[in-house]
Amino acid sequence: MDKVIKVILLINNERLISEIVEIGADVGEPDCRLIKPHVICESTLTPWMLNDTNQTEFMISSDKIITIADPKPDLLEKYLKKIN
């Protein structure tokens, strides 16, 4: 299965780039798995929640997401180099 890597805009206006997997869940439970999410800040990518945890996978509720989009090719390339 190919990785689905997207730019994610959260309701707090934080922009992430991450592999994302939709998970079947009960109403109110987290239903998206973010794998190796990174915060996009101008031209810098920083692992999400870097100062708080060593985890690289996070569960999030889709109601915390405003929109999901395909990353520009240069951003995708930068992200892939960073995580590999």
Give, region by region, the residue ranges found by the protein language model:
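Conserved RNA-binding domains used in RNP assembly and mRNA/RNA metabolism
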Residues: 1-84
